[in-house]
């Protein structure tokens, strides 16, 4: 199916490329005219273009002259002139496509064209990079073009506080990483004050290394969370010790391909004996199974120095695609805690989700989206299906002459590594630069050790040395350089033969004390001379390295994705330079062992001799087959993640929009009055027991429960007399009108006491508090639902359809609870006892936290943390910049109707189950035997988890009360 889509997509490429060529011709036709302009005339182009846009001209009409202007400014400030193919790439980006341009073709410079053009509209342009260093470096270097033309340039980096972030977002052009942009969006939707907002919309984004961000990281949702209730760290430590006593294949099974484990009968017996329990699979022990599975996964599937490193007592995840450390990220669902217990470091508390969004849904919010990469064509169908982005391959400026050799395959890793060292020694002896790509930190260190033994000087670039990656990559093309890199971690910095001129010039100026931030004028003044000086130094060495064959790229094993391999190969042969690449494989490599057992068997049958490799097209083809199988599986995972997130996205999109309206001061008084009416009607319907006759209603229960929400002054006997002759809907309406009228009168008295302005502010802040709290609980329940929804497939039901259906029901129930709790809090605050609105809100919070009718999970402390959690045991990412106020506000979701600025339930308000008063509001009866009256406890169960007894209550509200 994907192949058919690929062919269909390519059918229109010729027409698109012709349009791009026409743009390049139009820009070239203006070159002489623009080149003749003075610096002042060039600077005047920006206000001229803005005026033309205001007068009705489209960006497409302005594009040729705007591109020509940027090209001329680039020549004057950077000494770089955009090639025709770069002009074509710029047009492709402006029209909302992915420009596939090979490594070394100057993608960073290409982005300046559409970035400037779209920034003229004054709505902001976001340029998205893969790490903070590149965001900072590119904003400095390319910012010289923008600043010359009168544009403001901002850069978002991890350490910045909200006021600084707001300033950066208000710039015409803002650089930053995908995670920073995404987290700021989530934090904005947790803010309690308009002044706390930092972003100003999502107009146009250009994503650098778009395949890495929108494909490789698409399985990883961004999540802001804080510590959950309860301390269960002892269970992780206990199970870490327990699994050391278990034996693989005897006590448990491991499927490395699918990354799943299964406990066998002998293992179950050992676990039960160790824990002193009779039956591991009793409902009371449900939580223990999760600890056991995670402990086995930590032991067998997650390896130190491959999947993670341990630094200063902390477990840090290594990105499987780039080899970089992912600071602050954590595996989800208790897996990270299991690894911490395995390594004997501090086991940190589990987290509870406050706000979440996938990268897929975040980037689909932009009015226009574009991207750049050297390797997108293999995923063209996915880009179109998910993001509506076409992929346009842009030809290279000079013909590619790199030699890509067939793979060499050896029997064992030991034989392969010996051959690699021999090959590197030969290349190094003649001075040819060599780049060795490895798939893990562990592998890079093994190769480094062997090179040390062979006395071959080299640089290592892996997750443990990620701080110096750009500096190492910048000199990796110099004569005699040998660089060992994990999955080519330094993407974004070109490997130029002889050295990277711009990087070396920038480094020289900074070493002399000049920088764009601190001394911008001196930096600009000295840049041309320093650049020419470095160019002269590099030129001779560049020619010498070309004569030696250019950069030799040696892959020590194949990655699961063809794109990662192509990215490694793409480091060589830039801008028409010579180069060579080859991959060394062994039958023991993970890809071969797990995904192509048939090929391994065929090769073994040929009776390979020790140290003797096989070099054949069939081997390379077999590897590609294995890679396609993995890519197909990963694509299905990403599609599945998106399908499930789309359910939440519909709720999240509406409520975030409505929440922003409340935050920005819209009057919600009418909504509060509607909340009062809806809540009263819901209680009446819950008390009528399905009977149309008022005499059969539970009047005592109704007024007792209703008074916990609205302390009504209406007399029960009087109401019963008034509705005595009415039936059905008319009776409900009559009772509702009487109680609502009384409630409105009380509410009016409240307004007289606190003042109209004070009450409006109180309403806004109470609504935000309740929305955020209920949304947090809703996220928790939705996570729990998703965790177990796959089992519905065993009952011949579609898990996704079930998730949509039950998620919608839970969502509507949440809306009812939001209305009810908002009304309850507003009516239970003692306005006469508080002097200010702030004090009133404080009392509201205290009331909310102490009332036994409202379930409030604990939020983060003053150092609230944000995390990127992932589906299927991917990763989480922390952000310690969340301040205390944001940490309290835990995001909300709901649905809107008409012009209302607050959530309402769907087409028809959902009534409470079984025609009764809501569970949380029913009168407590001394005679009623509670589920937890049997005195049992269920060790290891989280406080917010459903109680294993089956009552449907959270553990802390059920048998958890028996814990001392």
UniProtKB/Swiss-Prot annotation:
Residues 889-900 have a biased composition (Low complexity). Gene3D superfamilies: 3.10.450.50, Helical scaffold and wing domains of SecA, P-loop containing nucleotide triphosphate hydrolases, SecA, preprotein cross-linking domain. The keyword Cell membrane applies. GO terms for cellular component: cell envelope Sec protein transport complex; cytosol; plasma membrane. It is found in: Cell membrane; Cytoplasm. It comes from the Bacteria. Residues 848-964 are annotated as: Disordered. One of its GO terms (biological process) is protein transport by the Sec complex. Its EC number is 7.4.2.8. One of its GO terms (molecular function) is metal ion binding. Residues 871-882 have a biased composition (Acidic residues). It is a peripheral membrane protein. It catalyses: ATP + H2O + cellular proteinSide 1 = ADP + phosphate + cellular proteinSide 2. Keywords: ATP-binding, Cell membrane, Cytoplasm, Membrane, Metal-binding, Nucleotide-binding, Protein transport, Translocase, Translocation, Transport, Zinc. May bind 1 zinc ion per subunit. It is an enzyme of class 7 (translocase). Its main location: membrane. The keyword Coiled coil does not apply. Zn(2+) binds at residues 947, 949, 958-959. Its cofactor is Zn(2+). ATP binds at residues 86, 104-108, 494. InterPro entries: Helicase_ATP-bd, Helicase_C-like, P-loop_NTPase, SEC_C_motif, SecA, SecA_CS, SecA_DEAD, SecA_motor_DEAD. Part of the Sec protein translocase complex. Interacts with the SecYEG preprotein conducting channel. Has a central role in coupling the hydrolysis of ATP to the transfer of proteins into and across the cell membrane, serving as an ATP-driven molecular motor driving the stepwise translocation of polypeptide chains across the membrane. Belongs to the SecA family. Monomer and homodimer. Part of the essential Sec protein translocation apparatus which comprises SecA, SecYEG and auxiliary proteins SecDF. Other proteins may also be involved. This is Protein translocase subunit SecA. The gene is secA.
């Amino acid at each position: 199916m994907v192949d058919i889509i690929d062919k269909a997509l390519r059918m229109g490429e010729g027409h698109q490329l012709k349009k791009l060529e026409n743009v390049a011709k139009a820009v070239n036709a203006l070159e002489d005219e623009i080149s003749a302009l003075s610096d002042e005339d060039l600077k005047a182009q920006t206000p001229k273009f803005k005026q033309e846009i205001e007068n009705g001209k489209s960006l497409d009409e302005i594009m040729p002259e705007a591109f020509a202007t940027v090209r001329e400014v680039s020549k004057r400030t950077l000494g770089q002139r955009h090639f025709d193919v770069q002009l074509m790439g710029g047009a492709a980006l402006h029209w909302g496509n992915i420009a596939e341009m090979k490594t070394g073709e100057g993608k960073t410079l290409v982005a300046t064209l559409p970035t400037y053009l779209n920034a003229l509209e004054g709505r902001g342009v976001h340029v998205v990079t893969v790490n903070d260093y590149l965001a900072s470096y590119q904003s400095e270097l390319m910012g010289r073009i923008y600043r010359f033309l009168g544009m403001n340039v901002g850069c978002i980096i991890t350490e910045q506080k909200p006021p600084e972030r707001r300033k950066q977002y208000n710039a015409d052009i803002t650089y930053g990483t995908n995670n920073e942009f995404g987290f700021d969006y989530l934090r904005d939707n947790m803010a309690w004050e308009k002044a706390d907002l930092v972003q100003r919309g999502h107009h146009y984004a250009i994503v650098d290394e778009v395949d890495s961000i929108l494909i490789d990281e698409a399985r990883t949702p961004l999540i802001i969370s804080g510590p959950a209730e309860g301390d269960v760290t002892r269970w992780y430590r206990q199970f870490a010790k327990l699994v050391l006593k278990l034996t693989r294949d005897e006590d448990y099974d491991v499927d490395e391909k699918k990354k799943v484990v299964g406990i066998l009968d002998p293992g179950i017996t050992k676990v039960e004996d160790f824990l002193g329990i009779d039956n591991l699979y009793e409902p009371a022990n449900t939580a223990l199974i999760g600890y056991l599975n995670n402990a086995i996964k930590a032991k067998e599937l997650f390896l130190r120095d491959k999947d993670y490193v341990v630094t200063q007592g902390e477990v840090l995840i290594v990105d499987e695609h780039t080899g970089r450390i992912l600071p602050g990220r954590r595996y989800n669902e208790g897996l990270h805690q299991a690894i911490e217990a395995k390594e004997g470091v501090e086991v940190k508390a589990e987290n509870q989700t406050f706000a979440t969004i996938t990268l897929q849904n975040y980037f689909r919010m932009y009015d226009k989206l574009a991207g750049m990469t050297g390797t997108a064509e293999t995923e063209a169908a996915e880009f179109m299906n998910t993001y509506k982005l076409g992929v346009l391959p842009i030809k290279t400026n000079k013909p590619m002459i790199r030699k890509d050799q067939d793979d060499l395959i050896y029997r064992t890793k030991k034989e392969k590594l010996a051959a690699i060292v021999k090959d590197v020694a030969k290349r190094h002896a003649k001075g040819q630069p060599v780049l060795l790509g490895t798939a893990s930190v562990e592998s890079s260190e093994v190769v480094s050790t062997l090179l040390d033994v062979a006395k071959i000087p080299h640089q290592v670039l892996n997750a443990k040395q990620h701080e110096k990656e750009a500096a190492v990559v910048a000199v990796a093309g110099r004569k005699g350089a040998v660089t060992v890199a994990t999955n080519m971690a330094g993407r974004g910095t070109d490997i130029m033969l002889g050295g990277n001129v711009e990087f070396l010039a920038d480094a020289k100026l900074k070493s002399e004390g000049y920088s764009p931030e601190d001394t911008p004028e001196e930096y600009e003044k000295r840049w041309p001379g320093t650049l020419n000086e470095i160019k002269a130094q590099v030129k001779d060495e560049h020619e010498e390295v070309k004569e030696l064959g250019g950069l030799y790229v040696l892959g020590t094993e194949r990655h699961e994705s063809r794109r990662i391999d192509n990215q490694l190969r793409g480091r060589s042969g830039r801008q028409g330079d010579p180069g060579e690449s080859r991959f060394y494989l062994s039958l023991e490599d993970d890809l071969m062992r797990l995904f192509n057992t048939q090929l391994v068997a065929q090769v073994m049958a040929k009776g390979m001799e020790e140290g003797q490799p096989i070099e054949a097209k069939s081997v390379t083809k077999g590897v590609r087959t294995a890679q396609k199988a993995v890519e197909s599986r990963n694509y299905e995972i990403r599609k599945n993640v998106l399908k499930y997130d789309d359910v939440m996205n519909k709720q999240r999109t509406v409520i975030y929009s409505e929440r922003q309206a409340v935050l920005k001061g819209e009057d919600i008084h009418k909504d509060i009055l509607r909340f009062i009416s809806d809540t009263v009607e819901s209680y009446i319907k819950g008390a009528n027991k399905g009977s149309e006759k008022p005499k059969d209603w539970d009047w005592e229960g109704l007024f007792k429960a209703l008074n916990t929400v609205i302390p009504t002054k209406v007399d029960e006997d009087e109401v019963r007399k008034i509705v005595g002759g009415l039936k059905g809907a008319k009776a409900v309406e009559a009772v509702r009108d009487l109680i609502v009228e009384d409630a409105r009168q009380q509410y009016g008295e409240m307004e007289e006491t606190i003042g109209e302005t004070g009450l409006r502010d109180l309403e806004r802040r109470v609504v935000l508090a309740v929305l955020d709290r209920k949304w947090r609980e809703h996220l928790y329940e939705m996570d729990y639902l998703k965790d177990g929804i796959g089992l519905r497939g065993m009952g011949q039901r579609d898990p996704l359809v079930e998730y949509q259906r039950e998620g919608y029901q839970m969502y509507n129930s949440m809306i009812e609870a939001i209305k009810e709790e908002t009304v309850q809090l507003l009516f239970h605050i003692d306005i006469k006892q508080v002097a200010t609105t702030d004090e009133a809100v404080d009392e509201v919070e205290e009331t909310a936290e102490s009332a036994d009718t409202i379930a409030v999970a604990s939020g983060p402390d003053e150092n609230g943390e944000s995390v990127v959690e992932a589906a299927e045991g991917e990763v989480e990412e922390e952000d310690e910049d969340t301040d205390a106020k944001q940490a309290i506000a835990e995001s909300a979701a709901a649905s809107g109707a008409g012009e209302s600025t607050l959530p309402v339930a769907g087409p028809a308000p959902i009534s409470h189950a079984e025609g009764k008063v809501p569970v949380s509001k029913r009168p407590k009866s001394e005679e009623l035997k509670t589920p937890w009256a049997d005195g049992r406890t269920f060790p290891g169960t989280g406080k917010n988890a459903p109680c294993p007894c089956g009552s449907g209550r959270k553990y802390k509200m059920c048998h958890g009360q028996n814990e001392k």
